[in-house]
């Protein structure tokens, strides 16, 4: 049984197994698992992930705006507070922790603008989370992001450590490997209740999850394409000397 199959099973089939397997099969995640991802492509990931993740509170607020239940909004507000450094996972905003990590590695996001695939991922997540049907936003943000963060980040952390990035500077990843599963389970409870009331909406939920996971797959694929293009440009420049 593949890790993607195991994860999907733990979520009672809510997570699209085929989409997860395609995500795991990307060259980037494969290299991370094998411990052979280059430092260059990992640095590219860290910067592009910043361009995506800095909008996380916008994604969450968009979803919150479409939840009719006050209890549901209250439950997810805890996630928002933690992102802002006001919850139980620490007193520093997560965006600041990420920036500190980039600074430790000498990476400046403004020097590497978002790739087209990164911009597409951001726009798709915002669009789906803003949908008037909360199951669309839950499919994207829960099933397409929070629920798979521990699974994906563990692979990336393996790649970062194998490439020699100091563990002391990588606290952002263990924090989310340990913490995001709880956030996802909070959303899962909302999803299960919504599906009990509206069982015909299961395909809507799954479609949103598949769409955002595919956008994430394209995001990962672009990292190694960019690496190959950079290597090709370097060879051409060397040949011209």
Write out the residue ranges for each language-model feature.
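Non-heme di-metal
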Residues: 1-241
């Amino acid at each position: 049984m593949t890790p993607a199959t195991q994860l999907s099973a733990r979520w009672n089939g809510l997570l699209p197994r085929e989409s997860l397997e395609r995500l795991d099969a990307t060259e980037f995640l494969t290299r991370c698992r094998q411990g052979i991802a280059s430092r260059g492509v990992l640095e590219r990931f860290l910067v592009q992930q910043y361009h995506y993740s800095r909008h996380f509170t916008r994604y969450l607020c968009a979803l919150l705006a479409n939840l009719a239940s006050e209890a549901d909004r209250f439950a997810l507000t805890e996630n928002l507070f933690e992102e802002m450094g006001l919850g139980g996972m620490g007193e520093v905003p997560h965006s600041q922790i990420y920036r500190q990590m980039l600074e430790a590695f000498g990476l400046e996001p403004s020097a590497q603008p978002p790739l087209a695939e990164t911009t597409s991922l951001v726009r798709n997540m915002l669009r789906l989370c803003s949908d008037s049907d909360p199951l669309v936003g839950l499919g994207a943000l829960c099933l397409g992001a929070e629920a798979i963060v521990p699974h994906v980040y563990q692979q990336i952390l393996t790649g970062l450590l194998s490439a020699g990035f100091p563990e002391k500077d990588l606290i952002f990843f263990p924090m989310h490997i340990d913490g995001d599963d709880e956030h996802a389970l909070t959303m899962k409870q909302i999803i299960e209740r919504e599906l009990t009331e509206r069982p015909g909406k299961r395909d809507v939920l799954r479609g949103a999850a598949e769409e955002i996971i595919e956008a994430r797959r394209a995001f990962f694929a672009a990292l190694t394409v960019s690496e190959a293009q950079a290597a090709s440009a370097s060879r051409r420049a060397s040949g011209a000397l």
